[in-house]
Amino acid sequence: MKLALVSAEAYPFSKTGGLGDVVGSLFKEFIKAGIDVTLFLPFYKITRDNFSNSVVNAEIVYGAPIGLNTLFGAVRVAKVSVDSDDNLIIEPSKKGNLFFIEHNNFFDRNELYGTNHGEYLDNAERFVFFSRAVLEICKIMNLNFDVIHCHDWHTALIPLYLKTLYRECSCFEKTKTVLTVHNLGYQGIFPREKLELTGFGQEMFHIDGLEFYGMVNFLKGGLFNADIITTVSPTYAKEILTPDYGAGLDGVLRKRKENLVGIINGIDYKIWNPEEDPFIAKKYGLQNINDKQKNKEDLIALAGINSSLQDPIIAFIGRMVYQKGIDIVVDAMPNLIKNGISFIFEGTGESYYEHKIRELQNSYPSKVFAFIGFDEALAHKIYAGADSLLVPSRYEPCGLSQLIAMRYGTIPICRKTGGLSDTVEDKVTGFLFSEYSSSALTHAISRFIEIYNNKQKFLEMIREAMKRDFSWSNSSKKYIELYRGLIGERERKTGTI
């Protein structure tokens, strides 16, 4: 099986969030599984700064059509393998499996998608170029992939291109496509005049094409044309079929529901491993869970809060934004603090909520610690030292923080939505609540405190949480099964098996 992954980002080469983690982890797992996999990425400034010595110019001449113009770019190539210690080995090679699409006007910028002032105004041009460049390179190099797996709106035009502008290309004759929607809230919506950039005319501006309330929607093109659509949890796959979660595309998704699959994300068990974590005060695992208390001591000292080892510490790590439920956390905190609970925050977000968290820290300096920013070492210390983690999201396609928390025996308290429903078992590995309100969150925290005060039951819950396997090894196998099913279906239809 020959597989291509096409994404706007992948760790460690480029990353702004969960998309980069997912694609980077899948690439690594597929290499380990012996899959013939190639990854296509833009050659961003941050990639050039960190990996310029690991790539070689492929010396391929190609032109990517953008509207009436053809723009030319370069390709940088590297060979990626995984050593016995699970580390990526990245070496320059023209026969590599990592292709970087280079175009300085589009990708040589400080940020991937935009600045604090907003998205880059030419994002449509940038990712049309990237998508067309990938396909043009495949043509020139005669790269015959069995499956091209696209990720999010940035590459969602590729399935549409393969069924239209590139349908006569022999190298794509047998290619199947998968499109993963990591978060339906991001769709690549642009003004109507951007349509011509895609290579399509007004014939594509209709309800079953790219038209979306008078605008152009890149993701919609992929949803209609990918052979399989995946999203990042089974529950989220069901939720997005409804108007409440479908972000205007629920009708399209209902038409494709027979081809829609939810696969839970994983976490990197090498990075997130309390038995080997270099950032935490005391390493621990299932065999020495009590050593987790040493990390609680360390966290109390670091945060400068007035809390004993017997007092519960509840953490929040992530974006301080409306979608993540920070508003109901802020509303619930004063009464909870009065009951002896301490809170630890790490993250950034909307200035209003950052200000609210700082206000709470100033009002309750002995019970609230907030780090407005992100520090990797601190995140590890919080996961290891806190007793519980809040994930009260309005919606959550999958969520990674609750998976990391369980890995560290830190009990998640989550709203029952999306991947949180699929990964946290109420009263077994964590606590779930349904209603989106500060009172429902407070009640869930009260249920947690009840178990927390029963040390035997609390220890049992920690053990159950730490036993769960959310490694990428598990998740990647489901994707491989999906690809093989697509290839088998193709071969049955063509009579080759």
UniProtKB/Swiss-Prot annotation:
HAMAP family: Glycogen_synth (MF_00484)
GO BP, one annotated term: glycogen biosynthetic process
Gene3D superfamilies in UniProt: Glycogen Phosphorylase B (3.40.50.2000)
Function description: Synthesizes alpha-1,4-glucan chains using ADP-glucose.
Family annotation (NCBIfam families): glgA, PRK00654.1-2
Superkingdom, taxonomy of origin: Bacteria
Source organism per UniProt: Thermodesulfovibrio yellowstonii (strain ATCC 51303 / DSM 11347 / YP87)
Pathway the protein acts in: Glycan biosynthesis; glycogen biosynthesis
Name listed for the protein in its UniProt record: Glycogen synthase
Keywords associated with the record: Glycogen biosynthesis, Glycosyltransferase, Transferase
Chain residues that bind ADP-alpha-D-glucose: 15
Cited SUPFAM superfamilies: UDP-Glycosyltransferase/glycogen phosphorylase
EC number of this enzyme: 2.4.1.21
Catalytic activity: [(1->4)-alpha-D-glucosyl](n) + ADP-alpha-D-glucose = [(1->4)-alpha-D-glucosyl](n+1) + ADP + H(+)
Pfam entry (one): Glyco_transf_5
Molecular function terms, GO-annotated: alpha-1,4-glucan glucosyltransferase (ADP-glucose donor) activity; alpha-1,4-glucan glucosyltransferase (UDP-glucose donor) activity
Similarity-based family: Belongs to the glycosyltransferase 1 family. Bacterial/plant glycogen synthase subfamily.
